[in-house]
């Protein structure tokens, strides 16, 4: 141990405690609670001190983007608090002392980039007498540069937060204590050193094995609210770092954190010889929203005005679109009901859309109408019927009740066949066009760390009948650096058909390409059953024919369906030709929103993938109050990690963003930002141009 460093650290700790006592004497209301700003991030991302993690968690829905720099390493990371008990971190590391490869013609002078994923679970929440307890796994699914496991305790007293932990792997490299698990079982005494497979595979055989180290620290909230100070004692000796053996003059690290609104800046001194700094931006995924310019809701009087007929039916029809975003196909009035058939075009929030529509109608509604029925369509499919109790809604909308609840004044159900038969609903036919922005991105490439391609998808189609249409889309590239590619196809000898690893050939063939062109048939088979069939050029790399059936009740947390497709690989030499490779692909698709994981959807696709491998793709999606959805997926098939190649199995992450977060007026629709660490040929599904689960989203809103 470096005693000079130890004495300095101990002196610093005494100063912190004495300062805390003086400050706390004037702030007795602090009690045992830690009076702090938002939890701060450690160097590699995730809530912690400097090099060591703690048991602390951010509030649920917090996303933090981090950049840190400490001489040999640079880190870019994103930490997301999915639940109050689960923290996840994805990270890229720049190892400045090592080249990306030994071949300048392949990667130039670029330095080594490595990716990693961390998770931390809270096992026990802090109470007055008990500390907070957490367990974590760092870099557990990558190449293992910082692979480690830890158990951490955190306990606050006044304006000081105390932390103690034990680490294995990278965090325990110094071996300053005995591994307690070694006393239980001999296999825990030695940590396996081999790299499993092709990387990307969870090294569970290493968990909590080998040398262990204790680490500890304190975080002090100064009387000046934006400033916090940190002191830690770490358990790593940096003897086996990827950047080379690093000199460590002290195991004490000190740092300061300054918070300005949602941005924090930190400065630290590590290993007794290295200065580091970082910048961090926090975003609340629950409350993030864009102020909107939208018309005021129509006032509702209670009791209702007495009238025998509509005061001004034309006014209703005009205001349904301008005030409520509802495009009316047709309407029908019976003895005690007013029925509207149409599309919701602008309002993503179903409750707001329903309230606006009902308010518009009630301003002119005859007194004898007891219920308003709204049949909402997607294309030509009637998906959901809302039955609004007029009297109950009028009281809630006029705030006649102490705690008005608009949602309790209407029900959602499958459209009633007798109600559908009352009106001759005009179906959408004819030409239609559209355009949307696309952005393709890739991280960690040998040519450049960040590579991108952006432009427009230009779509058009013709609806021939209620059920059949022909659709097409062209891809126009406007901005890219894919012209820096120094190879189109890797030289690996893969036993799998190259169903996706020709990707560079496809995306660089031309600035203007045909993305898809296909015929599409859809129909509602029963109250909760939907079907579709399609054929043509289905996606960038494949064409063929397919069909899908889906069972999805209204507002159910469960849906099930299947799809079956026969496809052939498209040529990357032109838009129209095909290669010889063909196959069947299809899946049983299960969609489940478990009650024990609020605002979460699990999707299981079980079947055969494009490379004729068989298995399951599991997709986890978490929605936040703002409408932002964060998801992750992994495909496990009968292809071994050696056959698959680098990455061991298909996995990826995505961020789904509602358009109206960036718009000043209400808008529907979404954009998706994917991150795929490694894309190989195993576990790859067909990118079908239309999916029934998306087409029927209004029946059980998850993304809206």
Question: What is each of the regions a protein language model found here?
Answer:
Residues 26-30, 90-118, 122, 136-140, ...:
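Outer-membrane beta-barrel translocator/channel fold
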Residues 63-67, 78, 88-90, 119, ...:
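Membrane-embedded beta-strand positions of outer-membrane beta-barrel proteins
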Residues 59-63, 74, 84-86, 129-133, ...:
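Outer-envelope beta-barrel architecture signal
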Residues 287-335:
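N-proximal, solvent-exposed amphipathic alpha-helical segments enriched in charged/polar residues
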Residues 65, 76-80, 117-121, 151-155, ...:
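Residues on the lipid-exposed face of transmembrane beta-strands in outer-membrane beta-barrel proteins
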Residues 24-64, 211-213, 290-300, 398-431, ...:
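Outer-membrane beta-barrel biogenesis signature
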Residues 82-84, 120-127, 157-159, 220-224, ...:
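Outer-membrane beta-barrel proteins
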Residues 24-145, 157-158, 170, 202, ...:
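Transmembrane beta-barrel domains of Gram-negative outer membranes and organellar outer membranes
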């Amino acid at each position: 141990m470096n005693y000079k460093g130890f004495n300095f650290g101990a002196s610093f700790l005494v100063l912190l405690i004495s300062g805390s006592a003086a400050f706390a004497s004037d702030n007795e209301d602090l009690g045992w609670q830690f009076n702090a700003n938002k939890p701060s991030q450690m160097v590699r991302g995730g809530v912690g001190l400097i090099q060591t993690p703690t048991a602390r968690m951010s509030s649920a829905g917090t996303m933090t983007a981090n950049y840190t720099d400490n001489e040999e390493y640079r880190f870019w990371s994103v930490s997301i608090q999915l639940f109050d008990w689960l923290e996840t971190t994805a990270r890229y590391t720049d190892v400045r002392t090592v080249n990306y490869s030994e071949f300048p013609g392949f990667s130039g002078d670029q330095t080594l980039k490595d990716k990693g994923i961390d998770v931390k679970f809270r096992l026990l929440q802090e109470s007055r007498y008990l500390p907070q307890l957490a367990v974590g796994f760092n870099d557990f699914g990558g190449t293992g540069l910082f692979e480690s496991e830890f158990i951490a305790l955190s306990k606050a007293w006044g304006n000081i937060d105390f932390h103690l932990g034990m680490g294995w792997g990278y965090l325990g490299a110094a071996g300053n204590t005995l591994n307690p698990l070694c006393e239980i079982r001999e296999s825990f005494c030695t940590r396996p050193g081999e790299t499993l497979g092709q990387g990307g595979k969870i090294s569970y055989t290493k968990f909590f094995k080998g040398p262990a180290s204790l680490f500890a620290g304190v975080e002090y909230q100064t009387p000046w609210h934006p400033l916090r100070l940190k002191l830690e004692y770490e358990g790593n000796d940096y003897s086996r770092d990827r950047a080379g053996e690093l000199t460590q003059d002290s195991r004490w690290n000190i740092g300061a954190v300054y918070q300005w609104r949602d941005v924090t800046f930190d400065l630290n001194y590590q290993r007794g010889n290295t200065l580091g700094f970082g910048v961090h931006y926090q975003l609340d995924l629950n409350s993030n929203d864009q102020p909107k310019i939208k018309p005021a809701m129509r006032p509702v009087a209670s009791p209702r005005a007495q009238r025998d007929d509509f005061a001004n039916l034309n006014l209703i029809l005009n205001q349904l679109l301008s005030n409520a975003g509802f495009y009316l196909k047709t309407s029908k009035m019976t003895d005690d009901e007013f029925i509207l058939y149409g599309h919701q075009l602008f309002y993503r929030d179903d409750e707001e859309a329903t309230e606006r529509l009902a308010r518009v109608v009630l301003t002119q509604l005859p007194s004898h109408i007891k219920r308003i029925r709204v049949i909402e369509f997607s294309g030509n499919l009637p998906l959901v019927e809302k039955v609004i109790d007029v009297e109950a809604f009028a009281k809630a909308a006029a705030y006649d009740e102490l705690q008005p609840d608009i949602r309790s004044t209407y029900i959602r159900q499958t459209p009633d066949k007798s109600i559908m038969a009352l009106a001759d609903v005009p179906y959408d036919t004819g030409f239609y066009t559209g355009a949307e922005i696309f952005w393709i991105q890739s991280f960690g490439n040998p040519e450049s760390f960040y590579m991108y391609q952006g432009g427009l998808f230009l779509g058009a189609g013709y609806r021939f009948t209620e059920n059949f249409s022909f659709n097409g889309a062209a891809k126009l590239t406007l901005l890219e650096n894919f012209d820096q590619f120094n190879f189109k196809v890797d030289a690996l000898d893969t036993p799998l058909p190259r169903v996706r690893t020709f990707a560079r050939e496809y995306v660089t063939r031309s600035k203007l390409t045909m993305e898809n062109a296909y015929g599409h048939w859809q129909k509602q088979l029963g109250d909760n059953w939907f079907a579709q069939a399609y054929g043509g050029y289905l996606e960038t790399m494949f064409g063929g024919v397919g069909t899908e059936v889906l069972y999805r009740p209204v507002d159910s947390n469960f849906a099930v369906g299947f799809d079956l497709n026969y496809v052939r690989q498209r040529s990357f030499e032109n838009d129209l030709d095909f290669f010889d490779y063909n196959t069947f692909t299809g899946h049983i698709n299960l969609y489940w929103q478990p009650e024990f994981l609020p605002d979460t959807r699990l999707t299981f696709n079980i079947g055969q993938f494009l490379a004729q491998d068989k298995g399951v793709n599991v997709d986890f999606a978490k929605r936040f109050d703002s409408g932002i959805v964060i998801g992750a997926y992994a495909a496990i098939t009968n292809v071994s990690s050696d056959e698959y190649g680098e990455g061991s199995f298909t996995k990826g992450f995505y961020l789904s963003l509602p358009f109206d977060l960036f718009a000043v007026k209400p808008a529907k629709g979404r954009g998706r930002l994917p991150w795929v660490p490694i894309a190989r040929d195993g576990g790859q599904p067909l990118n079908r141009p239309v999916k029934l689960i998306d087409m029927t989203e209004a029946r059980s809103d998850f993304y809206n």
